[in-house]
From Swiss-Prot:
Acts on the D-isomers of alanine, leucine, aspartate, glutamate, aminobutyrate, norvaline and asparagine. The enzyme transfers an amino group from a substrate D-amino acid to the pyridoxal phosphate cofactor to form pyridoxamine and an alpha-keto acid in the first half-reaction. The second half-reaction is the reverse of the first, transferring the amino group from the pyridoxamine to a second alpha-keto acid to form the product D-amino acid via a ping-pong mechanism. This is an important process in the formation of D-alanine and D-glutamate, which are essential bacterial cell wall components. Keywords: Aminotransferase, Pyridoxal phosphate, Transferase. It catalyses: D-alanine + 2-oxoglutarate = D-glutamate + pyruvate. It comes from Bacillus licheniformis. It comes from the Bacteria. This is D-alanine aminotransferase. CDD domains: D-AAT_like. GO terms for cellular component: cytosol. The keyword Secreted does not apply. NCBIfam families: D_amino_aminoT. Substrate binds at Y31, R98, H100. Transmembrane segments: none annotated. GO terms for biological process: D-amino acid biosynthetic process; D-amino acid catabolic process. Pyridoxal 5'-phosphate binds at R50, E176.
Amino acid sequence: MKVLFNGRLMERSECAVDIEDRGYQFGDGVYEVIRIYNGILFTLDEHIARLYKSAAEIGIDLSFSEAELKSQLKELVDINQRRDGGLYLQVTRGKAPRKHQYGAGLTPQVTAYTFPIQKPEKEQQNGVSAITADDMRWLRCDIKSLNLLYNVMIKQKAQEASAFEAILIRDGLVTEGTSSNVYVAKQNVIYTHPVTTLILNGITRMKVLQLCEENGLNYEEKAVTKDELLNADEVFITSTTAEVIPVTSIDGQTIGSGAPGPLTKNVQTALQNSILSETAKTV
């Protein structure tokens, strides 16, 4: 399998990261995960724009253009003949002697590779369970940082509880999942946390809200309480790899009817239609 390493395509076995790379020692970097459908990188423009924004927020200057990077990623997908799956893209600040502060002139290290994804069809159709947990992450969740330690810890707790996701609560309000955005439906209105530094503005989130507007589905960007979450008619989550998944129980409590609801199904259908439309190759 070929990987992209600092602008070059090479075998994965040939790729070597320096032990003093700041991404390795500090998690000093940013990343994106992009879904591949029909050999096409879905919402590529939005992912790359967010990568550059995240990099700028932490002071990483990318010397290459967005167009150059997109071209390299498309070539990577083609050379690996990856028709369906995902692409992981990471940028670190670069290598330097280990100390917290960083000097000028570091060269960012860019890596990318493709991987298979098994579409969570059963979960999308039947729904999943979730737990809640205190949101104790740092206050710049809008940056897609490599620092995911708390997310990892809480996601592991969810797995140990036989749950698919953990929904995070800060000051009594629902923020997001450990690796997803969260939506609460009540009386035919879909609520989701507004775009602030407390959540990552997910690419699938952006697409879903666009599709809600186009399909006449009512939504409001408003934080809801934990009680409102537990007493919702419907709850669902979105992410690049999960797409749209209904949540039918939280902390052992049944949500709504205990089955995927009509609003969730409408959002699922709208997203699938958008994916098919945007990744259809013309002859």
